[in-house]
UniProtKB/Swiss-Prot annotation:
InterPro entries: Arna-like_SDR_e, Bifun_polymyxin_resist_ArnA, Epimerase_deHydtase, Formyl_trans_C, Formyl_transf_N, Formyl_transf_N_sf, Formyl_transferase-like_C_sf, Lipid_A_modif_metabolic_enz. This is Bifunctional polymyxin resistance protein ArnA. It comes from the Bacteria. (6R)-10-formyltetrahydrofolate binds at residues 114, 136-140. Residues 1-304 are annotated as: Formyltransferase ArnAFT. The keyword Transferase applies. The active site is at 104 (proton donor), 434 (proton acceptor), 619 (proton donor). It comes from Salmonella gallinarum (strain 287/91 / NCTC 13346). Gene3D superfamilies: 3.40.50.12230, NAD(P)-binding Rossmann-like Domain (3.40.50.720). Residues 314-660 are annotated as: Dehydrogenase ArnADH. The record marks 102 as: Transition state stabilizer.
Length: 660
């Protein structure tokens, strides 16, 4: 039986080995690239796959139609997911005749969702387990195939329980996989009335509330002990982490948070005292409790507290859906540079935002807007400004997957707009320069230019009309129901983290990334229809500054406005862009590590994009609205943008890859 496996972490390694031991053929393994901001104490699925000689992939979005097609070509009989962190689309789940099955780290239907290992310890459970279940659209809700119970000892912490669960998972898989291979797959529906759901835990969730019962505080210490981020508190402004503790029943009448003694170090809780066995001050080393007290300058009677508040004024909460994308990650950086903004974000990956994951004002959840509607509705209600940035926005996908473009770019975003109407929240919506289509004006005016697209049999326009229709719906909600909105139209923004060379390899990237990939790989630069199409290229820093000013909305001047954000002075044809890029490439200090230039190749657009494609000769913005509403003017020259973008991509190429 041929299997395709989605796996990560120690549990992923156990699953892969168990599937092999049961005699399955593994056609491919899909995993994740390690996050540099995460403590990767666990085994590497990619390394295991490489050692076993099994093809392994780590796409940013495995649910992308390109990857769905590739998985379909593998023709799996069965699909397994072992601690893979992303939900799989229904298209993938339906590819295997025998079904798709996930290993979950709890006794379902209890503890559905994220981090069940930590949550069972937080809640003081005495038993947990692992469950193999059939995968359906809703996470962790499918029929149960098999489960294995695991007792939780009073001295178990996150790491010891993790090891127990891995061992139980291996026993479970060794028992059930041979049976499944013979076609005998048990199926027991979950009792929805017994289901509980828990969300992702963040490092800041380790903050101790000394007014809680001592058992609650002790369980928190157990749940997030190393290698997890740890339970922590403050002595004044100094943070310290507690790595191990024990319960003492007598608080001697002390107030919660009071230091009862320093040797041993004991702190009063609501109904007892916590003895701190080991801990760590700031970024220092782990020491015993009495030494920690000495380091912190604690004395009996001192009161521990929460971190000091920075300001009495509530910060502005900004919800960014698609926060890991090009605009989303740069906008997050700009907002976090201002003290009065708090960012909440969702996306299907976190590679571009890994540098923010530990930031105290950045709150990220990995998820899909087409699945996590309850989370989105809750955060629309909670936040002040909403930016729905999720969209398929690469031309080749318009002809490859027009229905998927419509479903995501229009239908899913319309639901978010309706939440904004329902809760009366301000929305800053990304329209697109593509809505102008084949407009013949010398420069495109937001309030006067006609929006002209081609015939219905040219699916290339599905993105343009999806965005245009949403623009019109948003405008109508503003007129009829008082929705506060601003529409912004980016004109060919460029810069670091635009997309990836891997995306370019499958044709799903912006023009400059495709050009850079050709230089990196020593293949001819393809000029579609000769590359005579003109665009106005805008530096991401200029674009983000304009977008930031829209969010600030000084004097409410952006309400109900459509604003082009582009640089009319940076107009160039694609051929001119390629020539400028080649010149910068030849001068780059890493040039010697890459193959010789392979020349230019003129390609017909039909052969490259498909028969449903049409192009436009020029696309230049009028930026009068931006000047008037934002006091904004772009300032960065195109050459500077090209050089910085090129440098980012060249330095992202692995040294071994350069040499090959």
């Amino acid at each position: 039986m041929k299997a395709v496996i989605f796996a990560y972490h120690d549990m992923g390694c156990q699953g892969v080995q168990a599937v092999l031991d049961a005699g399955y053929e593994i056609a491919a393994i899909f995993t994740h690239a390690d996050n540099p901001a995460e403590n990767t104490f666990f085994g590497s699925v990619s390394r295991l796959a490489a050692e076993l000689g099994i093809p392994v992939y780590a796409p940013d979005n495995v649910n992308h139609p390109i990857w769905v097609d590739r998985i379909a070509e593998l023709a799996p009989d069965i699909i397994f997911s072992f601690y893979y962190r992303n939900l799989l689309s229904e298209e993938i789940l339906h590819l295997a005749p025998a079904g798709a099955f996930n290993l979950h780290g709890s006794l379902l239907p209890a503890y559905r969702g994220r981090a069940p290992l930590n949550w069972v310890l937080v809640n003081g459970e005495s038993e947990t387990g692992v469950t193999l279940h059939r995968m359906v659209k809703r996470a962790d809700a499918g029929e149960i195939v098999a489960s294995q119970r695991v007792a939780i000892a009073q001295d178990d912490v996150a790491l010891t329980l993790h090891h127990k669960l891995c061992q139980a998972a291996r026993q479970l898989l060794n028992s059930i996989l041979p049976t499944m291979k013979c076609g005998d797959i048990p199926s027991v529906p979950q009792r929805e009335s017994d289901a509980t759901y828990y969300g992702r835990r963040r490092p800041e969730d380790g903050l101790i509330d000394w007014h809680k019962p001592v058992s609650t505080v002790h369980n928190l210490v157990r749940a997030v002990a190393a290698p997890w981020p740890g339970a922590f508190s403050y002595n004044g402004s100094q943070k310290f982490t507690i790595w191990s503790s024990r319960i003492c029943p007598d608080a001697q009448g002390a107030l919660p948070g009071s230091v009862i003694s320093v040797s041993p170090l004991r702190v009063a809780c609501a109904d007892g005292a916590l003895e701190i066995i080991t801990g760590q001050a700031g970024d220092g080393i782990t020491v015993q409790g009495s030494q920690l007290a000495q380091t912190l300058g604690l004395v009996a009677g001192a009161r521990l507290n929460r971190p000091p508040a920075t300001s009495g004024k509530r910060r502005i909460r900004v919800l960014i859906l698609g926060v890991n994308g090009f605009i989303g990650n740069h906008l997050t950086e700009r907002l976090l540079n201002e003290e009065n903004y708090e960012v909440y974000g969702m996306d299907i990956g976190s590679n571009a935002i890994s540098r923010f994951l530990l930031h105290p004002r950045f709150h990220f959840v990995e998820g899909d807007i087409s699945i996590h509607s309850e989370w989105i509705e809750y955060h629309v209600k909670k936040c002040d400004v909403v930016l729905p940035l999720v969209a398929i926005a690469t031309p080749i996908e318009y002809t490859r997957n027009p229905l998927r473009v419509f479903e995501l770019d229009f239908e899913e975003n319309l639901r978010i707009i309706r939440y904004c109407v329902k809760y009366r929240k301000r929305v800053v919506f990304p329209s697109t320069s593509e809505v102008y289509g084949m407009c013949t004006d010398a420069s495109f005016d937001e309030d006067k230019s006609n929006l002209i697209v081609g015939p219905v049999n040219k699916p290339r326009w599905i993105y343009s009309v999806s965005k245009q229709l949403l623009d019109r719906v948003i405008w109508a909600y503003g007129e009829k129901e008082g929705l506060r909105f601003t529409l912004f139209r980016p004109f060919n923004w460029m810069g670091p983290r635009l997309d990836s060379l891997n995306a370019a390899r499958i044709g799903s990237s912006r023009a400059i990334t495709q050009l850079i990939l050709s230089l990196v790989e020593g293949t001819p630069i393809k000029l579609i229809d000769g590359g005579q199409q003109k665009r106005c290229f805008t530096d991401i820093r200029d674009g983000i500054e304009a977008l930031f000013r829209i969010i600030v909305n000084d004097g409410d001047r952006c309400d109900g406005k459509i604003i082009n954000i582009g640089n009319p002075d940076n107009e160039a044809s694609i051929q001119e862009l390629a020539t400028l890029l080649l010149d910068s490439f030849d001068k780059h200090p890493l040039r010697c590590h890459f193959p010789p230039f392979a020349g230019f190749q003129v390609v017909e657009s039909r052969s490259y994009y498909g028969k449903g494609y049409q192009d436009v000769a020029h696309r230049k913005p009028s930026i009068d609205n931006a000047r008037r509403c934002l006091g904004w003017e772009p300032s960065i020259a195109m050459r500077d943008t090209v050089e910085e973008t090129l440098d980012f991509f060249l330095r992202s190429v692995d040294v071994a890859e350069r040499a090959s």
